[in-house]
Regions:
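Conserved double-stranded beta-helix
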Residues: 1-67
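Non-heme Fe(II)/2-oxoglutarate
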Residues: 79-86, 106, 113-178
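Residue-level marker of positions within ordered structural domains that often coincide
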Residues: 1, 57, 109, 134-136
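Surface-exposed loop/turn and secondary-structure junction residues enriched for glycine/proline
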Residues: 9, 14-15, 26, 33, ...
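Double-stranded beta-helix
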Residues: 45-51, 57-116
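Short edge-strand/loop segments of extracellular domains
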Residues: 14, 69-76, 132-138
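Short, surface-exposed loop/helix-turn segments at secondary-structure junctions
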Residues: 25-37, 81-95, 125, 144-149
């Protein structure tokens, strides 16, 4: 929507021998709840931040793609500590889904969904840019300075419209921006 901006960005390159990572959330849970307290489906679930993986090369099962557990963002909890290494972790009976794709594809997921990099099994590894977009009231993880905004001069020059400048963080700080 119009009320979001880039809150973080990173580049990832996992080698072909990547052993996989634990289940985790990049942010959240944003609406924490104890086990057994489910979300009331009559209320739209709020999205505070999303992650985007911009694939720089094809990413298939042998490359160790990101896996997500569908619906886990609605749990209000982190993945159970006793299962963070379990590749078959489920939530509400739903098994993990691999975010496979071709170079140039973008995989989007809610930042508080349980996800992990899977074990590479003979491919070339993962290679992607990761961008997190958050609601405007969520502070950017990379803070601008007087000298640099973590953007190249060319990128700053291309941000022409107010919306483009807001999206990449070229805006006056709000309360939570520090």
């Amino acid at each position: 929507g119009e009320d979001c901006h880039v809150i973080a960005n990173t580049a990832w390159r996992n080698p072909p021998e990547f052993a996989g990572g634990p289940w985790h959330c990049d942010a959240g849970p944003h609406v924490p709840r104890p086990k057994g307290v489910e979300w009331d489906d009559r209320i739209p679930y709020p999205v505070f931040a999303i992650g985007a993986h911009l694939l720089l090369r094809d990413c298939r099962r042998p490359d160790g793609p990101t896996a997500v557990v569908p619906g886990s963002h609605r749990s209000g909890r982190l993945a159970p500590l006793s299962q963070i290494e379990d590749p078959d972790l489920t939530y509400d009976g739903r098994a993990p889904v691999l975010l496979e794709g071709s170079a140039g594809d973008v995989a989007l997921f809610v930042s508080d969904v349980w996800h992990r990099g899977t074990t590479a099994t003979g491919g070339s590894g993962r290679c992607f840019l990761q961008v997190h977009y958050g609601r405007r009231d969520i502070a950017q993880r990379i803070r601008p300075t007087d000298v640099a905004n973590q953007l190249s001069p060319d990128a700053i020059e291309r941000a022409i419209t107010t919306r483009q400048r807001d999206l990449v963080g070229l805006h006056d700080p709000y309360f939570y921006d520090g």
